[in-house]
A protein has these predicted regions:
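Amphipathic alpha-helical hairpins
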Residues: 1-200
């Protein structure tokens, strides 16, 4: 079957193939920026899974007698750039981890949407081998997203909130001290004027 949905399907496959190649480079950087050992492991484990996704996509191309070729995925490229910007921020470690999880989940959700469509199209066109391979990738993307969610809700988000509260607590005494100093300075002239009045 050529033309129509087949061409759109192959186009989406090439987009997904490029996305996985980009993520192969990005995931180790997310791992390196992570403070949590569990989060670092999650990113590195998913990088290994991503290598498998690349291999399976190549099998999908072969099953369709299509040339293995990627097409630049602007969507994932944008998500990766946002992740790089986050890593340049001066956040406390827990907040950085929370933001890295958010970045990782953005890419997972993008891929889940893409693979969900690819599975549906493969089934509609009777490409059972391709559908099975793509479904296996989709299942791993969902599992990776769930793992990140567990890490976020299992302590990292709470640690980030606690860190923000501690920062506010540290700033409050200094702010009160500055405020107190300003009040004293304003009162001083009035106090001296009162003394002059008494001397008269």
């Amino acid at each position: 079957m050529q033309g129509g949905l087949h061409d759109a399907f192959v186009d989406e496959l090439r987009d997904a193939y490029d996305a996985e190649k980009q993520l192969l480079k990005a995931l180790p950087k997310l791992a390196k920026a992570s403070e949590s050992e569990e989060l670092r492991t999650a990113f590195l484990d998913h990088a290994e899974e991503t290598r498998g996704h690349v291999d399976r996509l190549e099998q999908v191309f072969a099953s369709l007698d299509e040339k293995v070729r990627g097409k630049h995925c602007d969507g994932i490229a944008g998500i990766i750039e946002e992740g790089k910007a986050v890593m340049e921020e001066d956040f406390d470690p827990a907040t950085m981890d929370a933001c890295l999880i958010a970045s990782g989940q953005r890419s997972e959700h993008y891929e889940m949407a893409a693979y969900g469509t690819l599975v549906a199209w493969a089934k509609a066109m009777g490409h059972s081998e391709a559908a099975d391979l793509l479904q296996s990738i989709l299942d791993e993307e969902k599992a990776a997203d769930e793992k990140l969610n567990e890490l976020a809700e299992g302590g990292i988000n709470q640690q980030a909130v606690a860190g923000a509260i501690d920062d506010d607590s540290d700033e409050a005494p200094a702010a009160r001290k500055r405020s107190s100093g300003k009040t004293s300075a304003k009162r001083a002239p009035a106090s001296r004027a009162a003394k002059r009045g008494k001397r008269r």
